[in-house]
């Protein structure tokens, strides 16, 4: 057994016991749209499209207690591949080194989310970050997000940075309609598997470990091993 398989086994065991994801077990699934604001050809090849998004809490602590928060979205199948493109983010700090570190928060607003790992594209390393632009009440309950989407929409500002350079606007992500889901009917986002040609997470050893963890988690909770936009 490979070391990556061995290290990923706890994810399967935890998912089997909980019958749900070990991390980010509960979230709000919604449809929406991403609109590119960066000039064409500048930075990562994210284009305007419909998306499937999920806002979640990493530990799943109920109510307004501090937790890590997550944002995931799926872009449609690319013309050159049969799989869509998944992007996953979690709450982090704001500095260069803080991009690598998880940071709990007490509020949906004034919180930075990062991909935690850079994306390799055109021989360069690119980072993504997101910040919620919608004004939200104090607190960290998922009901706040769900109610805001149902009543109106939630908007995230998506930015990109090359290497240690400054972040620049890339796109606006809007989630506008919640999708009913439960423990048996949810979407398994996987940025290590669902990507497009020329874009990959790095470093490779960490991507391999993360890929095994996602696979074991799906196996543990009997989640479908497939990807679709809806």
Where do the model's predicted regions map?
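Active-site-adjacent core segments of small-molecule enzymes
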Residues: 1-230
């Amino acid at each position: 057994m490979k070391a990556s398989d061995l290290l990923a086994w706890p994810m399967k065991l935890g998912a089997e016991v909980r019958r749900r994801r070990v991390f980010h077990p509960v979230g709000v699934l919604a449809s929406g749209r991403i609109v590119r604001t960066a000039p064409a050809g500048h930075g990562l090849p994210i284009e305007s499209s419909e998306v499937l998004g999920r806002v979640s809490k990493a530990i799943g602590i109920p109510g307004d207690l501090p937790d890590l928060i997550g944002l995931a979205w799926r872009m449609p199948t690319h013309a050159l591949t049969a799989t869509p493109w998944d992007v996953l983010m979690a709450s982090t700090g704001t500095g260069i080194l803080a991009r690598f570190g998880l940071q709990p928060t007490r509020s949906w607003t004034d919180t930075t989310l990062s991909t935690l790992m850079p994306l390799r594209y055109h021989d360069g390393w690119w980072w993504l970050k997101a910040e919620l632009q919608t004004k939200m009440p104090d607190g960290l309950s998922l009901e706040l997000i769900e109610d805001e989407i149902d009543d109106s929409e939630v908007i995230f500002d998506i930015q990109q940075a090359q290497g240690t350079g400054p972040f620049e606007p890339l796109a606006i992500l809007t989630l506008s309609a919640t999708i009913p889901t439960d423990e048996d009917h949810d979407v398994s986002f996987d940025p290590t598997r669902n990507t497009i040609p020329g874009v990959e997470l790095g470093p490779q050893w960490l991507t391999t470990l993360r890929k095994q963890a996602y696979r074991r988690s799906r196996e543990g909770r009997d989640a479908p091993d497939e990807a679709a936009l809806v």
